[in-house]
């Protein structure tokens, strides 16, 4: 879709029943759905300024507004919605499903590292919670079985290792290192 003439899309995955999830917006929660909200970089900038309040959370307030809209449209309690947000285009979505024995895992990933790739261990760590993040590679992992909190934490580590290896294999350099 569009907002203010700029690209804005939402990927929403509904669950048949509440699922224990881990989300960058909300942490561990019992979710009825998971979403990835994608807005054009200029949309984040302009709406971030429009949503800028006394608390200085422009982009975050814009994302929370969209998350609330989506929850209302789909008759979901916002607290039961695992949420992510990105400026990466959802047209850059990769979907892969693999099975092993009784386990099936589907991964939905969006990436936008052409102009905002930050490399841990190379670039200065300037991101602080509550300030505007510099970019994202969002990865949604869906399974057909319930994972314990410890298993979700282990899966997050494995996904991060895989993402790191993929960026190295693709020779994606930092766009910030001089």
Predicted feature locations:
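Alpha/propeptide regions of enzymes that mature by internal proteolysis
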Residues: 1-178
């Amino acid at each position: 879709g569009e907002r203010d003439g700029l690209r804005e899309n939402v990927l929403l995955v509904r669950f048949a029943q509440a699922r224990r999830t881990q989300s960058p917006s909300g942490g561990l929660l019992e979710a009825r759905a998971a979403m990835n909200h994608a807005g054009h970089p200029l949309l984040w900038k302009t709406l971030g300024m429009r949503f800028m309040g006394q608390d200085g959370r422009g982009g975050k307030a814009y994302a929370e507004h969209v998350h609330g809209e989506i929850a209302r449209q789909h008759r979901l309690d916002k607290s039961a919605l695992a949420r992510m947000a990105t400026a990466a285009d959802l047209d850059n979505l990769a979907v892969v499903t693999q099975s092993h024995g009784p386990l099936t895992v589907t991964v939905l990933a969006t990436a936008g590292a052409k102009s905002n790739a930050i490399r841990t261990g190379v670039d200065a760590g300037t991101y602080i919670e509550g300030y505007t993040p510099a970019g994202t590679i969002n990865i949604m992992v869906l399974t057909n079985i319930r994972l314990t909190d410890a298993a979700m934490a282990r899966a997050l580590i494995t996904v991060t290792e895989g993402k790191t290896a993929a960026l190295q294999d693709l020779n994606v350099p930092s766009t910030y290192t001089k």
